[in-house]
Amino acid sequence: MAKTLFEKIWDSHKVSEINGRSLIYVDRHMVHEVTSPQAFDGLRINKRNVRRKDLTFATMDHNVPTTNRKLPIVDQISETQIKTLEKNCQEFGIPLFGLDSPYQGIVHVIGPELGITLPGTTIVCGDSHTSTHGAFGAFALGIGTSDVEHVLATQCLVLDKPKTFEIRVDGKRKNIHAITAKDIILSIIKKIGTAGGNGTVLEYRGQAISDLSMDERRTICNMSIEGGTRAGLIAPDAKTFDYLRGRKYTPKNYDDLVEKWKQALKTDIGAKFDKSFVIDAEQIVPQVSWGTNPAMTADVTESIPEPSEFAKGDSSQEIAAKIGRAHV
């Protein structure tokens, strides 16, 4: 049976299924200082250890000083969270990219830069924009603190299988310098709305997506969450494989894996998506956000819509639009 890329990744990581819910194996668990303290406390209370220390990677992320790191951290909560992660990683034997590590960085940046993120893998992190890793052909999703504890203890996660949603961006951009990846994703969210992807995983396809650099693809997948979806992904190609080659954690048999990925990690011809949306890249122009959510976006050539026009009969949206316009 023909399958989508997401369905292939899901099926290859499904451990079991009970009452319609699936137990999914997690290949990579990224941890940072903000959403992990209570999870480690839960392990202590229940006298559990970390199941796969070798597949768990911690980094200082949210509370890192942007200037002199040798100076004390002024915010007391931030300092406590950083010290707590250091303590927890030492106690549970988890590798940590601390403030003095050359590998420390924003979690969704260092994952690919270090070769931790790989095509066809499942990746979780206690951060809503974990979908960024989907740019590399991974099923990556943000999870809450209770699920962080569950993955630390079991290396698995119980999930309802999302629906599949194809976003196809056909054709080429008129000007690759003027029309950015951010313009593409804002155009999409403007059309489908911030709840358009609820209960789905997006797969971005089409010529305009293939033309994007890996950084641009990360921009697209990062903002999938703003469309209400659980995750977004793009099939890996030569750009993906070249980017990840030779990184610190890239597997030694990488070239062999690439040959397998070329054949396996793509949506089959004839595969059916539950939903589909098509947009013409040539029609996309620079976007301007005028409100308080990503759907409140207009072409740079357009006027800001009236609240009633934007809301289309939804009173809550009309109120939101009025608030949004007040900030312009």
Residue ranges of predicted features:
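Fe-S-dependent hydro-lyases/dehydratases of central metabolism
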Residues: M1-R325
